[in-house]
Structures are given as structure tokens and as C-alpha cells.
Amino acid sequence: MKHYDSTLPYPRDLVGYGASPPHAAWPAQARIALQFVLNYEEGAENSVLHGDAASEQFLSEMASPAPFAARHLSMESLYEYGSRAGVWRILREFERRQLPLTVFGVSMALQRHPELCAAFKELGHEIACHGWRWISYQNLDEASEREHMRIGMQILTELTGERPLGWYTGRDSPQTHRLVADFGGFEYDSDYYGDDLPFWMRVQKSDGSVAPQLIVPYTLDTNDMRFASSQGFAQGDDFFSYLKDSFDVLYAEGDPAGLNTPKMLSIGMHCRLLGRPGRMKSLQKFLDYVQSHSQVWICRRIDIARHWKQAHPYLPPTPAGSGICRPGPDPGSSATPPLDCGSGPQ
């Protein structure tokens, strides 16, 4: 068992913004920033067709399926539902309502479906890089993970004509944040689930230098993946109720007459899961509910990142700082202070 060197500074930030989060100052005085992510992974999952040792086991209609060292045709077809039918059902719904999406696109998957990639681009949805493969990187060697990142970005750039500006691995490794910083050029990294607001993370790169990286947190709770987990959603009403409760709490927290602490809410979607007819109704109900409220900013993740950089720019560390990015000295003022990042580890 490998133990962390206790003589080194503790590398986790358990405090964050603490009791005084910064005022997000969302556009048009919105009380909440709401962001929908569509994960596109079908065709890049574990498969012997892709050179993997066994078939996929994660996020499908099957409960705890065994890995097969051969093609698993049932598992393949469950994934194919997402790329053949589910994705179009979700896309049509957002197009009908003229609402934006961020697509977490796995490059191998998008490469296999050029019509869909073109549709994402034509509809103005952001395509963030979700890696080259949709596999677990926890135990993959660093050189291979770095190469997968390079290939993923290269393919996505070739497919869309634009370099991806957002990153999300999902099943990441201890070195993922560092490798993202090594490549540079990303406006945000979303491999984090521990806050309701974006924040600046100081990442030590492989060459020893430190770079500020904006983190736009993602979610595993307001996420349709819980339809495929043991403690998750059994039916669409469970999903709708959980999303509604999450929205209501955050919308209330953003009330200028109350706490006046606007937050962000991410909704995670998967084509093969939420794209099923029996679950789609819950999404429609939630969208109806959200659109009955006036002070909601529905946006893409890149929009949140750019807003945050303008409203809460990164400040270099101060000698007496703690290393944690917190609001400036007057969080109660009407102006939005920049974030003060101390000199400690992040």
C-alpha cells in the first residue's frame, strides 16, 4: 500500500470558499446558472473491437454485468441505442426549446458518427473533450494517458475545426489535472464534483511550474447515470423530483432578498440512458418547470468559464496566503471582488 508523505503539505482543499462564497454575478442578475451536459460516449467504450481485454461493464441497463473477453453483443446494442435513437430525441428537445448544451464528446465516438458531430456544431452546442477513449484511467500509465489526451484533442480539432476549450475525463487518474495543465489552452477543467461554484486551482505541472486552472465543477448526483446505479433512480419521476428539489434550493439561495449567493447547477445526461422514452418525459417536465422561472441563466460550460474569468479573475498568490482561492477583502460590497489565491498547495 502506498502512503502519502505526511511531511508534505496536505494536497486536498477541504475548505474551499468557506462560509463566504463570492457572489457569482451571473448575467441579467440570474439567481442560478443552469447547465446541461450531454455525454457522448457510444462507440468508445471498453470492447475487444477497440483492443481492450474485455467488454464494458459500466452505465448500461444491465446490473453488474460480467466482463467478457469477447464481443458482448447485448452490451454493444445498449450503447448503440444512444447513438442511433436516444441522442436525436434529446437533441430535438433542446432544439425545439432553443436551449444550449455542452457535449462531453469522446473523440473516438464522435469520429464514428460524423453526422452527429456536424449536428452538434450546426446547433451551436459546445463540444468539450471527453478524452479519446471512454475507459478508466485510474491505473493506466501516465505516458498512455498523455497520449490518449493528445489523440483526443487532435481528432476533435479535426472534426470540428476548433480546438476544444473544456476538458472532462470522468474516470480520471491522480495525474489527470496535471496532464491537462501540461497541455494548456483549456479554459476550464471539469474533473471535479466538490462545489457549487467555479474556482481557481493552482496545478503543479510536470516541469515543476505552477499554473492557474479554472475548475467548473460537474455532478454525479443530478445525473441520469443514477438510473444505472444501485442507489439511483427507478423511474422518471425520481429523476424529475431530485432535479426539481436541487433547482429549488439553489434558486432560493440566489434570491437577492435572502442569502443572495447565486450558484450553478449541472445536469448530466447520457444518450443511451435519458434518451429512452420512459425517461425522456422527466427531462421534458423539468425543462417546463425551469422555464417557468424568470431569473435563470441556461448556458454552456464555456459561457460559465468565460464569465467567471471576467467577474472573478485569478490573482497570483500572496506570501501570507493559504493557497485557497477565496473572495477578496470585501465580499459584502456590491462590486464583485477578484479571488485571492494564497501560496499554499491546491
PLM regions with names:
Residues 222-242:
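Binuclear metal-dependent hydrolase catalytic cores centered on His/Asp/Glu-rich metal-binding motifs
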Residues 2-214, 240-267, 273-333:
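Catalytic alpha-helical scaffold of carbohydrate-active enzymes acting on polysaccharides/glycoconjugates
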Residues 328-339, 343-346:
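A cross-taxon signal for low-complexity, glycine/charged-rich
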Residues 207-227:
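A structural motif
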